[in-house]
Amino acid sequence: MDIIRRIEQTMMREDVPPVEVGDTVRVKWRFTERDRSGEDKSRVQAYEGIVIAKKGTGISESIVVRKISSGVGVEKTFPLHSPNLVDLEVVTRGKVRRAKLYYLREKKHLVVKKKSRF
């Protein structure tokens, strides 16, 4: 068991800022696509939204980010220690009273009472 922990420690990223539920974050994620000629192309896409859930610990830690795009709610799960994660920036800090903000799925516009914390 000690071997697994040591391997996980070498794979974990240290440049990931602390993120809590209720924070508004901007995630830059690298996608690799294959074009018609068969070449692999990678591009970076930014995704900004509210963190509605935080799951796991250690190397398996991930966050669920929700945003409204063209009137439709979109949620994406991002592993925090993935090599495809280019940048994670906390835009605003929020203080909420729940561990999971799944009730935002029922709201049309991300109307949530958030206190900003410093």
Curated annotation (Swiss-Prot):
Recorded coiled-coil stretches: none
InterPro entries in alphabetical order: Ribosomal_bL19 (IPR001857), Ribosomal_bL19_CS (IPR018257), Ribosomal_bL19_sf (IPR038657), Translation_prot_SH3-like_sf (IPR008991)
Keywords: Ribonucleoprotein, Ribosomal protein
GO BP annotations, alphabetical order: translation
Cellular component aspect of the GO annotation: cytosolic large ribosomal subunit
Family indicated by similarity: Belongs to the bacterial ribosomal protein bL19 family.
Biological function: This protein is located at the 30S-50S ribosomal subunit interface and may play a role in the structure and function of the aminoacyl-tRNA binding site.
Listed name of the protein: Large ribosomal subunit protein bL19
Species per Swiss-Prot/TrEMBL record: Coprothermobacter proteolyticus (strain ATCC 35245 / DSM 5265 / OCM 4 / BT)
